[in-house]
């Protein structure tokens, strides 16, 4: 599969396209509709939806409500997509397809940074999350919130200084995450 630089970007971009989906929809309902600043009034027979909006408003949701399920699945799906892309790209000989080892390291650090993002969001929504380092890890128990926080911190402290620097505002970029300092 890895026969050109474009094929590495196809794998690198998958966790980022998942992120684009992830940042909207169900997360909005959990973080905005559950506050006093938003409301979702019932209009006729079509807005009740089995009481899911009511449960959000009154903070009586259950683990089976779609917003919770989709958020958990989206969070863990983002983590798994990033870990899978990382495993795939770590096995690629970048020099053989015309890319440098520095580009490879940058790609891996971008994936570590987005993995940290998904763990950070999971920590916000659910507290401690099971921590995985590889797609080959077996099922893991839930880690504590502190362990999850430390995992996020480690990923970011290692990734951010090693990311390629942002060269100019608004210019075309190679990759998805740049160090903007």
Q: Model-predicted segments: where are they?
A:
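Conserved, well-structured interaction surfaces
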Residues: 9, 17-22, 46-126, 138-150, ...
């Amino acid at each position: 599969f890895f026969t050109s630089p474009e094929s590495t970007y196809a794998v690198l971009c998958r966790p980022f396209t998942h992120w684009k989906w992830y940042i909207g929809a169900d997360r909005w309902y959990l973080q905005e509709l559950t506050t006093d600043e938003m409301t979702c009034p019932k209009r006729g027979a079509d807005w009740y939806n089995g009481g899911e909006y009511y449960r959000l408003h009154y903070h009586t949701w259950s683990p089976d409500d779609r917003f919770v399920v989709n958020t958990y699945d989206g969070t863990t799906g983002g983590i798994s997509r990033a870990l899978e892309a990382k495993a795939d790209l770590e096995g690629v000989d970048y020099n053989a397809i015309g890319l440098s080892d520095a580009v490879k390291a940058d790609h891996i650090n971008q994936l570590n940074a987005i993995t940290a993002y998904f763990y950070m969001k999971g920590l916000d929504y659910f507290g401690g999350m099971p921590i995985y380092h590889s797609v080959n890890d077996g099922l893991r128990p839930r880690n504590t919130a502190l362990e999850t926080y430390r995992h996020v911190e480690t990923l970011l402290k290692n990734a951010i200084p090693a990311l390629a620097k942002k060269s100019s505002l608004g210019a075309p970029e190679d990759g998805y995450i740049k160090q903007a300092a």
